[in-house]
């Protein structure tokens, strides 16, 4: 087993490949962790959300976030309890989050979600009311690191 730090490029590669991650926010010194769908583009993560809720309230109070993705590859069984292990990769992101208010920026971010998650070429156009009724969290990445154990 070789543990190694991933390059920034490999960490970004995994960010582009993973389908969901875990967003950590804080309010009143209480951490809050939630699974989310996201897209990555040019040192930003975009997260689709309801307009209200704990994660939105936390971001409005404290914009500092941590975001995590990971993938187990293989469980390694040993003869003794301390010989067990796991082949995996993981990526951590630290940054500042804010809620997009601009209609055009929200639309552009939602198009990134469609590109990543939809396999249909003939989707109907986005309804402006739907765009207004969704929150897009924009995370500016300040630090990204990844680790793998293959």
Residue positions per predicted region:
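Extreme N-terminal tail/first-helix region
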Residues: 1-17
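Charged, gly/pro-rich active-site loop segments
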Residues: 2, 72-150
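Short Pro/Gly-enriched beta-strand edge/turn motifs at strand-loop
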Residues: 5, 17-20, 119-122
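Short beta-strand segments
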Residues: 17-51
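A generic structural signal for short beta-strands and their flanking turns/coil linkers
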Residues: 19-21, 34, 41-43, 61-65, ...
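A short mixed-secondary-structure module that forms the rim of ligand-binding clefts
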Residues: 39-74
């Amino acid at each position: 087993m070789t543990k190694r730090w991933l390059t920034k490029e490999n960490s970004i590669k995994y960010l582009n490949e993973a389908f969901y991650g875990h967003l950590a926010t804080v309010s009143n010194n209480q951490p809050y962790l939630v699974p989310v769908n996201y897209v990555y583009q040019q040192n930003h993560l975009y997260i689709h959300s309801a307009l209200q809720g704990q994660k939105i309230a936390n971001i409005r109070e404290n914009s500092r976030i941590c975001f995590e993705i990971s993938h187990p590859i293989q469980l390694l069984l040993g003869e003794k309890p301390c010989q067990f292990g796991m082949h995996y990769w993981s990526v951590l992101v630290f940054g500042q989050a804010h809620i997009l208010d601009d209609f055009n920026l929200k639309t552009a971010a939602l198009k990134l979600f469609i590109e990543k998650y939809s396999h249909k070429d003939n989707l109907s156009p986005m309804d402006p009311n739907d765009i207004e009724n969704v929150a897009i969290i924009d995370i500016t990445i300040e630090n990204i690191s990844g680790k793998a154990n293959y």
